[in-house]
């Protein structure tokens, strides 16, 4: 997992290429706002973006958020405590970095579970 503070460095061409590449799947929960904020940094056409919360709703899964889906499909709970901290800080704390890495890893693992269970 790579963590970039894009509000500090901007959205470089290589990251825009990843976000616009239909061959690279990008997944997570409630991505609409994240994508809008990224497009404010630099315009791009998002491709192969999968919102797992929306997929869960379409499949009538009882949970739609990161914590609930993680518990249901991966069998453990993650803390959301660091999610409400100051993400614009010049230097992220170890807890913020761990949360961001966990969020990305869990999204990837949930994608595989959803794919295997044909929920996408």
What are these regions (language model features)?
Residues 1-113:
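Conserved DEDDh/DEDDy metal-dependent 3′-5′ exonuclease domain
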Residues 116-120:
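C-terminal helix/juxtamembrane-tail motif
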């Amino acid at each position: 997992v790579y963590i970039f503070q894009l509000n500090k460095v901007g959205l470089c061409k290589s990251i825009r290429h990843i976000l616009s590449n239909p061959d690279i799947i990008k997944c997570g929960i409630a991505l609409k706002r994240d994508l809008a904020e990224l497009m404010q940094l630099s315009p791009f056409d998002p491709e192969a973006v999968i919102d797992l919360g929306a997929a869960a709703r379409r499949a009538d899964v009882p949970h739609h958020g990161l914590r609930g889906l993680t518990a249901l499909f991966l069998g453990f709970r993650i803390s959301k405590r660091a999610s409400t901290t100051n993400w614009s800080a010049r230097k992220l704390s170890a807890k913020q970095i761990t949360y961001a890495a966990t969020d990305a890893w869990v999204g990837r693992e949930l994608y595989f579970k959803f794919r295997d269970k044909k929920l996408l």
